Amino acid sequence: GIHTNHGMYSTLYSFPTIMKRNAMKGSVIPVYSGLPTVLKDNGYYNLFFMTHESQYDNMNAFFRTNGFDEIYAEENYPKEKIANHFGVQDDYLYEYAIPILNERAQSGQPFFTVLLSISNHPPYVIPSYFHPKSDKIEDQIVEYADWSIRKFMTEAQKQPWFDNTLFILIGDHGKLVGTPENEMPESYNHVPLMMYGKGITPQAINDFGGQI
């Protein structure tokens, strides 16, 4: 797909994107069987963290109906941390999540968490405390996104739940690059997937795959 709602819908609930429709919107919200609901049925506690306000794309209602126990959004964050209409910046989102995940881990119940970042989406905002090396704003924001993830992973490594956690990094969709040759630019469908966890042997897999 070409929008965040497409990627979230397909990745979490294993349904193909309906290109001209946001499947998460509607007066009646369907209940899907997907990763959050299956994990919940097997004893997991599910959390969702987003940078922006919770009703964007009807996310709050949709995800609460479909397996998530807690949702954290712009309404939960201090006003001084709001950077623009997309809410807080990535590094603060990750920083905010750590103590909440620690609290969940202390309960002894396994948990599944989605952290939906925003930095690599225009309008780009580079925090004053981050000093990029690149000249172009498009490259600077990638540096910032990378730095934010590194900062989160460094802090996560200090937590007791780290060794028993599988981290999955995936994009919601690709980005338009160059001059498209098709009605649906192929670059929109080039989405990276990374898995990181204790005991996983480093390797690159080049097989074709999809979010569903």
Question: Where do the PLM segments sit?
Answer:
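Solvent-exposed soluble domains appended to multi-pass membrane proteins
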Residues: 1-212
